[in-house]
């Protein structure tokens, strides 16, 4: 006898059984079909879960059992309504996360994964991207429990390598069984809504790359038609042979800009060093170049959702080019959150934004570390080991950018104060677009009495007023959720009050 029991919070919702007669060595597929009355639906706000227990019985003796968790929800993604869970539109407040848990290493430890997901959810994120690997089961279990949506990612390379001896050696022979295992792993996890077929793929702008993209997307759809596909496209990588002409146009448009500098070795360090120069107006000009549109078109055509890494200038343009496709910022600069989220809120086809990164990680050492001695980022300067660019640091502490993001999302009402480190007053630091500001929420700076501190107030209010030891330092209008004060340091209490409509 095969018996299945569906439970919610330990209480049986329904039970059914089928009697089977099997000969030795015989196997059989058995199907159960149910109607759950008034189901408790799974969503990011209410992550209701069920458990299916399948038992093999001989009489009433249990010979074997298997338990599987699952959630009941509907999912749709389109350009008119964005992501809808159970019919309700959800904007993806996304965090890219790497595979490691800091000094614990790359092992998937259930308690560590739960802690990481809980902290990200508490910081305002409702989605993660498993950069750049299929997520572990413990991570998905935590996302199911906390109501965090998942973009699960296949690989960082296809057939063209980024580093010697990387996965490109095995991709062609392994991609199909890997997708099969990935879909089987994800199938019953309600948190998983997107399959990402690759990250910053070198051959994405070629005909062969477009065909590989189509094969990968079609395989995901065949195995799991309930979810959607995307590809995290990087313009510098996808441009291919067109890059020289595009960059020639960029440099003619912005002639005063220096060439790439810093960064050791190849792979992501070399790419990131070059990308440091491709932000702001220059980045937007690059992102919207007609030759880049040509390069990206093949992969964009065969994905359900257009995914863009550091191509913010294309977020609105893509709707003109592909009016029936949703668009997603699959990887973006942290400090651009105000502009990025404004685009997300104002455009139904923009389904969300994934910052790089939600949580600090090992590798790409020094990407976000401020150097005041002339040192360059991406140069692996001893003893740097972490990237130091997460909204949360390696210990799980929230950094000021995290609170600004929470305010921009509309999830935090109270103002937040952050002070540039006073020991570096007047000094010039290194800078990459993954860095925010070298500030922290502290008004304790012994030895700097009388020196001027640069104080940021982050708030969604129209105005803020800053007080030092009860004395007003004046009101300031907010510009992009920020007001900046120059304050002579005096020990005591620094406090901000927000005002909207004068109150």
Language-model features: where?
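The substrate-binding groove and active-site-proximal loops of carbohydrate-active enzymes
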Residues: 40, 44, 96-111, 119, ...
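Short Asp/Glu-rich motifs
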Residues: 102, 139-140, 161-163, 205, ...
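An active-site-proximal structural segment forming one wall of the substrate-binding cleft
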Residues: 171-189, 223, 286-291
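Substrate-binding clefts and catalytic carboxylate motifs of secreted carbohydrate-active enzymes
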Residues: 22, 193-195, 214, 218-222, ...
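Beta-strand-loop-alpha-helix segment that lines the small-molecule cofactor/substrate pocket
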Residues: 149-157
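Positions that flank functional sites
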Residues: 135-136, 157-158, 235, 359
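Secreted/periplasmic carbohydrate-active enzymes, especially glycoside hydrolases
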Residues: 1-137, 142, 146-147, 178, ...
């Amino acid at each position: 006898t095969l018996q299945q029991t569906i439970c919610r919070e330990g209480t049986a919702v329904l039970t059914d059984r089928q009697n089977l007669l099997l000969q030795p060595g015989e196997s059989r597929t058995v199907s159960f079909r149910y109607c759950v009355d008034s189901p408790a639906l799974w969503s990011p706000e209410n992550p209701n879960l069920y458990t299916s227990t399948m038992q093999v019985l001989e009489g009433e003796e249990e010979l074997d059992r298997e338990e599987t968790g699952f959630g009941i929800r509907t999912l749709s993604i389109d350009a008119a309504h964005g992501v809808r869970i159970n019919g309700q539109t959800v904007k993806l407040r996304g965090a890219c996360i790497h595979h490691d848990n800091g000094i614990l290493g790359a092992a998937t430890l259930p308690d560590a994964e739960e802690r990481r997901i809980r902290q990200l959810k508490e910081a305002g994120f409702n989605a993660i991207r498993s950069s750049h690997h299929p997520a572990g089961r413990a991570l998905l279990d935590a996302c199911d429990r906390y109501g965090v949506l998942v973009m699960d990612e296949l690989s960082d390379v296809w057939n063209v390598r980024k580093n010697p001896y990387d996965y490109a050696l095995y991709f062609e022979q392994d991609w199909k069984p890997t997708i099969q295992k990935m879909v089987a792993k994800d199938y019953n996890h309600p948190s998983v809504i997107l399959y990402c077929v690759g990250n910053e793929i070198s051959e994405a702008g070629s005909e062969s790359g477009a065909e590989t993209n189509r094969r990968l997307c079609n395989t995901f759809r065949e195995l799991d038609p309930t979810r959607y596909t995307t590809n995290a496209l990087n313009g510098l990588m996808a441009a291919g042979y067109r890059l020289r002409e595009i960059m020639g146009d960029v440099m003619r448009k912005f002639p005063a800009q220096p060439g790439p500098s810093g960064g050791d070795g190849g792979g992501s360090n070399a790419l990131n060093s070059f990308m440091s120069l491709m932000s702001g107006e220059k980045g937007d000009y690059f992102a919207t170049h007609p030759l880049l549109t040509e390069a990206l078109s093949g992969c964009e055509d065969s994905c359900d959702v257009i995914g863009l890494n550091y191509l913010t200038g294309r977020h609105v343009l893509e709707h003109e080019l592909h009016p029936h496709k949703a668009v997603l910022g699959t990887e973006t600069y942290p400090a651009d959150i105000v502009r990025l989220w404004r685009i997300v809120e104002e455009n139904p086809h923009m389904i969300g934004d994934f910052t790089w990164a939600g949580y600090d990680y090992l590798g790409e050492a020094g990407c976000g570390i401020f150097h005041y001695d002339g040192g360059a980022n991406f140069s692996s300067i001893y003893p740097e080991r972490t990237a130091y660019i997460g909204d949360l640091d390696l210990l799980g502490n929230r950094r000021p950018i995290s609170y600004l993001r929470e305010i921009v999302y509309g999830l935090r009402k109270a103002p937040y104060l952050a002070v540039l480190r006073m020991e570096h007053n007047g000094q010039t630091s290194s800078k990459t677009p993954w860095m925010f500001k070298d500030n922290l929420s502290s008004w304790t700076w012994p030895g700097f009495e009388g020196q001027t501190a640069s104080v940021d107030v982050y708030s969604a209010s129209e105005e803020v007023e800053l007080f030092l030891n009860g004395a007003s330092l004046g009101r300031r209008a907010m510009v992009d959720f920020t007001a900046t004060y120059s304050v002579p340091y005096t020990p005591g209490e620094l406090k901000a009050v927000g005002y909207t409509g004068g109150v």
